[in-house]
């Protein structure tokens, strides 16, 4: 009870009815569910990003305590609409833990994840939602992690071979169904790509995700003084325009031949 009061008490509300206040704190409680500390008191945690499960350990302080907690949860996908903002305002220490968790996975498995689950990569949904998470944290001064290493991993994800190249639920190590080669070469991810696997493979959705994530990476690059990368990713963030069909009034998928795809709804 006291523990939940501490977490929920980070935000105090005034006014409104009692029912509205109950609803607010119930929703805040929901926003804090689903994330689990999986590291032990000695800093050990299970990592499954390699071919075999192994025990890894968080660095310890001079007093022998872990410098942060290692967490597991579902994918980050969609968190930029609300949770990133909430956590950065009310629970910055939690964002630091999450950022360090993702960097643990980058060190262990070679990719910053969409979301660590069971000590492994989930490949749920599409894109690289971790970049908006890191950009939020970094630009709000939440930086108790290796920011240079984070940027290195996020930049890797923004090119072929990174996490974006995994379509939704595409688990193979040599994933390509995310269409990053098309995105870089053509300025959008087309539908009708050959040899595509996975559950979420639609090119228009990928293009819009990648463009937004490029914008986020551009903001982080700018804040870190990486001007060339800022210009690169800011320019790439305009790729969403390549799928705007003025005639239909919608974002509309294209094929590999550059033609609009009909009956796309």
Where on the chain are the PLM-derived regions?
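Acidic/polar, glycine-enriched structural segments that form the non-catalytic walls/loops
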Residues: 1-70, 144, 148-160
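Active-site-adjacent structural elements in folded domains
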Residues: 11-15, 42-72, 114-121, 167-206, ...
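A conserved hydrophobic secondary-structure block that centers on an alpha-helix together
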Residues: 14-17, 63, 69-85, 89-115, ...
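Structural helix-adjacent loops and short alpha-helical linkers that scaffold large soluble proteins
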Residues: 16-20, 36-46, 89-99, 138-152, ...
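Secondary-structure capping and boundary motifs in well-ordered enzyme cores
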Residues: 19-20, 69-78, 122-130, 205-210, ...
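Alpha-helical support elements that line or immediately flank enzyme active sites
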Residues: 24-41, 71-95, 135-141, 215-224
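Long, well-ordered core segments of solenoidal/helical folds
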Residues: 35, 91-113, 149-165, 179-195, ...
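Catalytic cores of carbohydrate-active enzymes
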Residues: 113, 218, 222-265
């Amino acid at each position: 009870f006291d523990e939940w009061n501490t977490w929920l008490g980070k935000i105090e509300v005034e006014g409104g009815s009692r029912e509205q206040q109950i609803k607010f704190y119930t929703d805040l409680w929901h926003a804090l569910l689903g994330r689990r500390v999986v590291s032990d008191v000695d800093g050990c945690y299970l990592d499954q990003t390699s071919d075999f499960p192994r025990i890894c350990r968080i660095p310890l302080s001079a007093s022998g305590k872990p410098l942060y907690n290692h967490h597991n949860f579902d994918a980050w996908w969609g968190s930029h609409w609300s949770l990133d903002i909430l956590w950065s305002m009310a629970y910055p220490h939690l964002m630091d833990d999450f950022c360090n968790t993702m960097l643990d996975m980058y060190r262990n498995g070679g990719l910053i994840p969409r979301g660590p689950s069971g000590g492994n990569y989930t490949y749920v949904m599409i894109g690289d939602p971790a970049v908006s998470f890191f950009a939020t944290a970094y630009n709000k001064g939440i930086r108790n992690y290796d920011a240079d290493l984070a940027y290195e991993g996020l930049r890797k994800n923004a090119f072929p071979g990174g996490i974006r190249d995994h379509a939704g639920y595409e688990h193979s190590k040599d994933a390509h169904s995310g269409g990053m080669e098309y995105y870089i070469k053509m300025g959008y991810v087309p539908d009708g790509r050959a040899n595509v696997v996975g559950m979420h493979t639609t090119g228009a959705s990928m293009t819009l995700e990648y463009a937004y994530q490029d914008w986020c990476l551009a903001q982080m690059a700018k804040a870190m003084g990486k001007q060339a990368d800022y210009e690169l990713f800011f320019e790439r963030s305009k790729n969403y325009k390549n799928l705007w069909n003025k005639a239909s009034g919608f974002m509309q998928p294209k094929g590999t031949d550059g033609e609009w795809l009909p009956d796309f709804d």
